[in-house]
Amino acid sequence: MGKIIGIDLGTTNSCVAIMEGNSVKVIENSEGARTTPSIIAYMEDGEILVGAPAKRQSVTNPKNTLYAVKRLIGRRFEEKEVQKDIGLMPYKIIKADNGDAWVEVRDQKLAPPQISAEVLRKMKKTAEDYLGEPVTEAVITVPAYFNDSQRQATKDAGRIAGLEVKRIINEPTAAALAFGLDKNEKGDRKIAVYDLGGGTFDVSIIEIADVDGEKQFEVLSTNGDTFLGGEDFDQRIIDYIIGEFKKEQGVDLSKDVLALQRLKESAEKAKIELSSSQQTEINLPYITADASGPKHLNLKITRAKLEALVEELIERTIEPCRVAIKDAGVKVGEIDDVILVGGMTRMPKVQEKVKEFFGKDPRRDVNPDEAVAVGAAIQGQVLSGDRKDVLLLDVTPLSLGIETLGGVMTKMINKNTTIPTKHSQVYSTADDNQGAVTIKVFQGEREMAAGNKLLGEFNLEGIPPAPRGTPQIEVSFDIDANGILHVGAKDKATGKENRITIKANSGLSEAEIEKMVKDAEANAEEDHKLRELADARNQGDALVHSTKKALTEYGDKLEAGEKEKIESALKDLEETLKSGSSDKAAIEAKIEVVATASQKMGEKMYADMQAAQGAEAAAAGAAGAGGAGASAGGASQQQDDVVDAEFKEVKKD
């Protein structure tokens, strides 16, 4: 069985790790970096760029370069968070036929899981290049506060990328695994994981206990905001720059897509620089132009200014911390360690706020960019059976229930219930002779069902006529270890049953996923063909260069017919290469013709080299012999009185 890899599929950056024995390896990608930007670019010729290459060209191709797609995964188009993003993103967010938020690129309609699958495929390839073998299984992390639709969509993304997702694991829980197994502290400890990433915020309170030599990680509570992260911090800086530039130059940059992309890049850099310095300068020449000519942007931003701009965002992370502490039934003073995860936690003001709330310095010995992928890799090792000393008890982040009479949300499973879990309850009909019931499943904490997230609905039909309140309908909820819900309804009188895995009326259908898997496989095949074509073209170019060089040196030693044959074959190959031909077989055939025609010249070159080496060796031998004679003669002239010693040959046994 191959290794199960751990993937942190992040909003801004992604990371992949594997376990090698008891040590973990965070794998560098083809560019040599341990994290990969979660950016995907769709090029005019159909090529798809992922990671750093996509990021590099984003300024010149903003409408077809997708980033922060994780903020759309598993979301409906009408959700206010999606509507907010529509105005901010340079790419086009559209409403899919099923009501989900999708993206339109180069006249193609793409689902967020399909786009995220490109990043997962890059992570898969990174691991395969390192291991030298195919990888088919993975543990993928999600924000702890992701709802059922978002978890299901992430699982779908894995499938489209050609991965069997063995487990969906919460990011803070993964970070706790990485921390808990790395440190050898004995006894029970309560830790708080504060995870502020590129697009999401989570906080989890986790108890790490030693139980008979086994480390047990029990999540006591979790809370968060799936639409709060580094992207929002960047946006505050961008808005500030736009405002200042408008005041100074009278030009509104918010309508200029190219300028916005440059501003985004600069805002991110400024934010990072201000974590280690007190002031930074944003310098963007030729940012735009008007009738009076080109405009240049030059602006100084201090750390104090940045902190003032984002203070409210940092403050928004504290309330979930309060709720998580309360839900866990612990006091702030009982928290032994505070772990910071996510790139945004490098910001000094964030660290200061966390220290202020928890009353202690956060740990500095956890890598905020890699801990989540490391934890996922550890869970992969547990699932493959190679590790027996770890037990992970995670929770469902939000309450689950059904809509009952009057639009009330009747909770079946409360938030922070340890998973996997099952719960069933008996309900009845609201009207006389009601022949069917519709079960509507919701997730959330509001009292009224309409205020929560509708996960899906289904019907139980064929209920025998009876007065209201008489039929007994048992509704069962079953949450698996991935946090994904399965619901069943059964008429106890007739035994009729209907069970579904909650696939919201949104989400991808099985047929759509199958199609995307096939498209992805076709893309991989196409990529392989393009790679082989590029290799053939490179081989052809190299052969043209080396043959021309050899002709310059040895052409006059060839018979006229032979030389013409080579020149004709060369011309043919060059023309094929210059025409941009995508016929690999034709290029290879022309390469073969040049190679065959050049055989005689190769033989002559080889013979000349042999002759030259022979001449050199002969010259060296003659020089050596002459030199020896001269020195011997000289010696005899100068030393006539020297007596020759007798010698005898000693034979070895």
Curated annotation (Swiss-Prot):
The question of whether Phosphoprotein is a record keyword is answered with yes
- Please provide an example of a Pfam family that matches this protein in its UniProt record: HSP70
Q: Where is the composition biased (Gly residues)?
A: 623-632
Name the Gene Ontology molecular function terms of this record.
Answer: ATP binding; ATP-dependent protein folding chaperone; unfolded protein binding
Record keywords, A-Z: ATP-binding, Chaperone, Nucleotide-binding, Phosphoprotein, Stress response
- Which InterPro entries does the protein's record reference? ATPase_NBD, Chaperone_DnaK, Heat_shock_70_CS, HSP70_C_sf, HSP70_peptide-bd_sf, Hsp_70_fam
What does the entry say induces or represses the expression of this protein?
By stress conditions e.g. heat shock.
Region described as Disordered: 615-653
List residues, modification Phosphothreonine.
T200
User: Is Phosphoprotein among this UniProt entry's keywords?
Assistant: yes
Which purpose does this protein serve, as stated in its record?
Acts as a chaperone.
Record NCBIfam families: PRK00290.1, PRK05183.1, prok_dnaK
* Protein family: Belongs to the heat shock protein 70 family.
Q: Which HAMAP family match?
A: DnaK
What is this protein identified as?
Answer: Chaperone protein DnaK
Q: Which organism is it from?
A: Paraburkholderia xenovorans (strain LB400)
Gene (name only)? dnaK
